[in-house]
Amino acid sequence: MYSSGIDIVDVLRIKKLHERFGERFLHKIYTKGELEYAFSTKEPYLRLAARFAAKEAAAKALGTGIGKVNFKDIEVVLGTDGPELIFHGYAAKIFQEKGFTGKSLSLSHEKKVAVAICVMWRD
């Protein structure tokens, strides 16, 4: 069985949220590693928007939506073949309880938008 989630995020929305709420916003949503990666690039808000979309897409694929899962329970890391998801806390618990055995993440972005799709499956 497969489960999927998709999300699209306006890059400017992420920048405006950071400007409005400051570091508090960033530290509520992103892990230390995600922030270090994003701000080491020329376009940090593009990277942050892609990770925000990934977290939303993964929460949808888990079947919970982001309301029940903490944003930081879903982490995006750079794997050898592209972005990968690492689940912590409640997200890891739900992934295991639902019997998922694998997950895949794809990110894409342009200047103004970022999109993510997440697929999970059971063997």
Swiss-Prot record:
Reaction catalysis annotation: apo-[ACP] + CoA = holo-[ACP] + adenosine 3',5'-bisphosphate + H(+)
Query: Which superkingdom heads the taxonomic lineage of this protein's source?
Result: Bacteria
Q: What class of enzyme is it?
A: transferase
Leader peptide range in chain numbering? none
GO biological processes = fatty acid biosynthetic process
Compartments annotated for it: namely: Cytoplasm
Which residues are noted in the entry as Mg(2+)-binding?
A: 7, 56
Write down the required cofactor(s): Mg(2+)
Query: A Gene Ontology MF term for this entry?
Result: magnesium ion binding
Q: Which UniProt keywords apply?
A: Cytoplasm, Fatty acid biosynthesis, Fatty acid metabolism, Lipid biosynthesis, Lipid metabolism, Magnesium, Metal-binding, Transferase
Query: Sorted alphabetically, which InterPro entries does this protein's record hold?
Result: 4-PPantetheinyl_Trfase_dom, 4-PPantetheinyl_Trfase_dom_sf, ACPS, Ppantetheine-prot_Trfase_dom
GO CC terms in record: cytoplasm
Pfam families given in the database record: ACPS
- Give the EC number: 2.7.8.7
UniProt cross-references to HAMAP family, sorted A to Z: AcpS
Q: What does this protein do?
A: Transfers the 4'-phosphopantetheine moiety from coenzyme A to a Ser of acyl-carrier-protein.
| Family recorded in the similarity comment | Belongs to the P-Pant transferase superfamily. AcpS family.
NCBIfam families noted in UniProt: acpS, pantethn_trn
State the protein's name.
Holo-[acyl-carrier-protein] synthase
Per the UniProt record, the source organism is Carboxydothermus hydrogenoformans (strain ATCC BAA-161 / DSM 6008 / Z-2901)
| Lineage of source species | Bacteria, Bacillati, Bacillota, Clostridia, Thermoanaerobacterales
